[in-house]
């Protein structure tokens, strides 16, 4: 019985690897992962074989976000509080973001549609802490092309409190992006629309109710 369980786990893990590899082959923006203690894994655009690398300054047990260009070159990464460039050096203004290194999904990074030089870091603080959900803009023309966080568009609050979960998906129009988070204490998902015009925090979000309320260990 244990043998069959182990075989099932191996098969499941193998299918996940194949699925992830196929996704990465289609979009180089997710081809570099940095996590844990100084660890990283990279997929070249021409292959689905991962290559391990070290040297990152990161030390964390929880969430990290990375972003690469369509040619699979690492651009920058963040643990929700600090931001490092492709050379593993902290950006000049890449500090003090209101996420948390102890947040399970501390940040997600997305490109601004139709603008190859602008990215947004959406951060979620540790459960129910004051940072909540916020965003900061990264200008890739700054810092000699290595990018920097725009001090005039940094830690822009969206809502609070928020849980530690966040994700992003493409809009059905193939251009825009939805950033999705769960609200605290209810069953609402909040979807924030990012377009070529930027982020509309007044009219650019949809609230959907489904599932069970998120209220700590008794929720999702």
Set out the residue ranges of the language-model regions.
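Bacterial Sec-dependent N-terminal signal peptides
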Residues: 1-30
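Structural signature of eukaryotic scaffold interfaces centered on beta-propeller domains
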Residues: 26-27, 59-73, 98-117, 158-176, ...
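Beta-strand-rich domains and repeat architectures in extracellular enzymes and scaffolds
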Residues: 26-78
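Structural motif
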Residues: 39-47, 83-87, 127-139, 186-193
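Blade-loop segments of beta-propeller domains
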Residues: 60-63, 74-132, 148-155
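Beta-propeller fold detector
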Residues: 92-95, 145-158, 200-211
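Short loop/turn segments immediately following beta-strands, especially the blade-tip
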Residues: 137-148, 192-201
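Beta-propeller domains
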Residues: 173-220
């Amino acid at each position: 019985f244990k043998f069959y369980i182990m075989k099932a786990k191996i098969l499941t893990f193998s299918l996940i690897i194949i699925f992830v590899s196929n996704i990465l082959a289609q979009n180089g923006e997710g081809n570099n992962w940095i996590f844990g203690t100084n660890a990283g894994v990279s997929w070249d655009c021409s292959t689905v074989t991962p290559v391990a690398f070290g040297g990152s300054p990161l030390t964390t047990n929880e969430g990290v976000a990375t972003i690469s260009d369509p040619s699979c070159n690492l651009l920058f990464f963040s643990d929700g509080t600090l931001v490092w460039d492709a050379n593993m050096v902290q950006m000049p203004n890449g500090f003090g973001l209101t996420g948390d290194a102890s947040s399970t999904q501390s940040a997600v990074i997305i490109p601004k549609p139709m603008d190859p030089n602008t990215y947004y870091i959406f951060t979620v603080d540790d459960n129910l802490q004051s940072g909540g959900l916020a965003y900061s803009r990264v200008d890739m023309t700054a810092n000699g092309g290595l990018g920097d966080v725009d001090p005039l568009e940094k830690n822009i609050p969206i809502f609070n409190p928020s849980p530690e979960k966040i994700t992003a998906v493409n809009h059905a129009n193939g251009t825009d992006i939805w950033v999705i988070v769960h609200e605290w204490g209810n069953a609402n998902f909040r979807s924030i629309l990012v377009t070529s015009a930027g982020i509309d925090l007044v009219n650019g979000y949809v609230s959907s109710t489904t599932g069970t309320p998120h209220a700590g260990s008794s929720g999702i």
